[in-house]
């Protein structure tokens, strides 16, 4: 099993299959992904934003809801956020930014997370809705200016 390491910018052989997190081995012939995020974040929803409620730099970009990790031990769990990726001509055109965060609360373990983003929708007014399958809530994010 090969995975892409965005920090090394290469595919590496997974430890369970004889790798050490650095060994390329039989992974060298695989294509690199168009875009990569940290391991185990768990993307659950993708929304291409076509509204005009948010500032212009968000138009035609992609929002991604990350459900959060469950198996990064001994590292701190990650994800539990919504990111934005700028797009141009159907491809990512810049670095992602954390758009909404803090869902896990102070406890960042899978069972201890207060909320886990799992769905995205755009409202008729262009606002962004985020659903949560841990706490059962829905957030509405609106832009009111600086």
Roles of regions detected by a PLM:
Residues 1-111, 115, 141-146:
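Beta-propeller domain segments
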Residues 62-64, 127-130:
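Hydrophobic beta-strand segments that make up the repeating blades of beta-propeller
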Residues 118, 124-126:
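Structured DNA-binding interfaces in DNA transaction proteins
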Residues 122, 132-133:
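Conserved beta-strand->loop/alpha-helix structural units within folded catalytic cores of enzymes
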Residues 134-136, 145:
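A short, acidic, flexible beta-alpha connecting loop/helix-capping segment that sits on the rim
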């Amino acid at each position: 099993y090969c995975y892409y390491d965005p920090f090394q910018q290469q595919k590496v052989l997974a430890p369970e299959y004889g790798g050490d997190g650095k060994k390329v081995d039989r992974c060298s012939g695989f294509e690199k992904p168009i875009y990569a995020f940290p391991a185990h974040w768990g993307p659950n929803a993708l929304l291409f934003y076509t509204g005009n409620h948010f500032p212009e730099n968000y138009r035609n970009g992609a929002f991604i809801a990350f459900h959060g990790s469950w198996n990064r031990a001994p590292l701190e769990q990650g994800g539990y956020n919504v990111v934005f990726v700028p797009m141009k001509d159907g491809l990512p055109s810049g670095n992602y930014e954390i758009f909404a965060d803090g869902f896990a609360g102070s406890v960042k373990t899978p069972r201890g997370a207060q909320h886990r983003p799992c769905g995205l929708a755009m409202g008729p007014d262009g606002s962004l809705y985020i659903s949560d399958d841990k706490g059962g809530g829905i957030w509405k994010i609106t832009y009111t200016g600086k």
